[in-house]
């Protein structure tokens, strides 16, 4: 069976116009070309698609069934050709973006929507991971882009462009004994269990770790749930409280004597210098760079 797009277009036109001659006019073909193409299609399918007893061809039941699927098949064939063309011009087969778990409450989906509108056939994979694991995914090639907080020490293999600033705040459950105090000291923080978002690799020291005793989790959702159950204090994204205002009734921001109890970090789009980025990844990087160059409103 050897069916091509032109045969399907002619079949669709005959079904919609009701005759070979009308289909020919619609497609800019001669009637004999349409008639021959339909005859060859019937041979390839081993089916009779049209009865030719009267002046105009009459679709058979089989033709009507196939016609229902023809439009979608033609759309998929066009999408296939467009995707093949995009791949030939440098579009990656798929793009994996890792989002640091504390940033899941931000507007990272804006960038995904932008990519989808520009590259509708691109396979996009979104994963979440702690900061240290996200960087490792870039360096080992399992992700091509990452949305991460700024790093104190840069790996010489990474490259980045700044996006914006985000804040994290130390919090504790309002039913925890420590919450009854208006101010707390660093010594009190040091002696209270901390719930820290950290790498799954226990050999890596977590960032924003202050307490002597701590429990680890790989995402801020779990950290929040444990903090709510009085299992410790922790540092959570301020954006969480905007998304879920009910948390303001259950959690208290810690006011620490010895340091400002609010951590502001730049958020970066990060990639590996050693990776050969495709057209979609490069497009997003260039988009963010160009946006940064625009004057603030």
Curated annotation (Swiss-Prot):
Inactivation phenotype: Deletion mutant shows a decrease in chlorhexidine resistance.
Positions of disulphide bridges: none
HTH lysR-type domain ranges (all copies): 1-60
Molecular functions per Gene Ontology: DNA-binding transcription factor activity; transcription cis-regulatory region binding
Main location (coarse class): cytoplasm
UniProt KW Kinase keyword: no
Annotated region of DNA binding: 20-39
Pfam families, alphabetized: HTH_1 (PF00126), LysR_substrate (PF03466)
Localization terms from the record: Cytoplasm
CC terms in the record's Gene Ontology section: cytoplasm
Superkingdom field: Bacteria
Keyword terms, alphabetized: Activator, Cytoplasm, DNA-binding, Repressor, Transcription, Transcription regulation
Known partners and oligomeric status: Homodimer and homotetramer. Binding of chlorhexidine at the inducer-binding domain causes a quaternary structural change that favors interactions between dimers to form tetramers.
Entry comment, domain topic: Binds DNA via its N-terminal domain and the inducer molecule via the C-terminal domain.
Function: Regulates the expression of the AceI transporter. Binds DNA and chlorhexidine. Binds to regulatory sites within the intergenic region between the aceI and aceR genes, and affects the interaction between RNA polymerase (RNAP) and promoter DNA both in the presence and in the absence of chlorhexidine. In the absence of chlorhexidine, prevents transcription of the aceI gene by disrupting interactions between the promoter DNA and RNAP. In the presence of chlorhexidine, activates expression of aceI.
Protein family (similarity comment): Belongs to the LysR transcriptional regulatory family.
UniProt-recorded name of the protein: HTH-type transcriptional regulator AceR
Source organism of this protein record: Acinetobacter baumannii (strain ATCC 17978 / DSM 105126 / CIP 53.77 / LMG 1025 / NCDC KC755 / 5377)
UniProt lineage: Bacteria, Pseudomonadati, Pseudomonadota, Gammaproteobacteria, Moraxellales
């Amino acid at each position: 069976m050897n069916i091509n797009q032109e045969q399907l277009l002619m079949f669709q036109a005959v079904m919609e116009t009701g005759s070979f001659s009308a289909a020919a006019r619609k497609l800019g073909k001669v009637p004999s070309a349409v008639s021959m193409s339909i005859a060859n299609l019937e041979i390839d399918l081993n089916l009779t698609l049209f009865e030719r007893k009267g002046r105009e061809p009459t679709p058979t039941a089989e033709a009507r069934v196939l016609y229902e699927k023809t439009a979608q098949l033609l759309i998929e064939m066009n999408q296939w050709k467009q995707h093949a063309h995009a791949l030939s011009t440098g579009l990656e087969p798929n793009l994996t973006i890792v989002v640091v778990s504390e940033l899941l409450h931000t507007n990272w989906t804006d960038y995904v929507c932008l990519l989808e509108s520009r590259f509708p056939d691109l396979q996009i994979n979104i994963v979440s991971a702690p900061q240290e694991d996200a960087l490792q995914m870039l360096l080992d090639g399992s992700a091509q882009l990452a949305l991460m907080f700024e790093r104190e020490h840069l790996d010489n293999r990474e490259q980045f462009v700044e996006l914006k600033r985000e804040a994290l705040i130390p919090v504790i459950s309002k039913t925890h004994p420590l919450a009854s105090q208006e101010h707390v000291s660093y010594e009190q923080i040091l002696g209270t269990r901390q719930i820290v978002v950290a790498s799954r690799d226990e050999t890596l020291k977590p960032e924003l770790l202050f307490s002597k005793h701590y429990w680890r989790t790989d995402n801020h959702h779990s950290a929040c749930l444990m903090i709510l159950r009085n299992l410790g204090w922790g540092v959570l994204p301020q954006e969480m409280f905007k998304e879920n205002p009910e948390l303001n009734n259950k959690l208290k921001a810690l006011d620490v004597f010895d340091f400002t109890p609010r951590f502001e970090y730049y958020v970066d789009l990060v990639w590996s210098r050693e990776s050969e980025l495709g057209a979609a990844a490069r497009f997003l990087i260039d988009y963010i760079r160009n946006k940064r160059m625009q004057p603030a409103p």
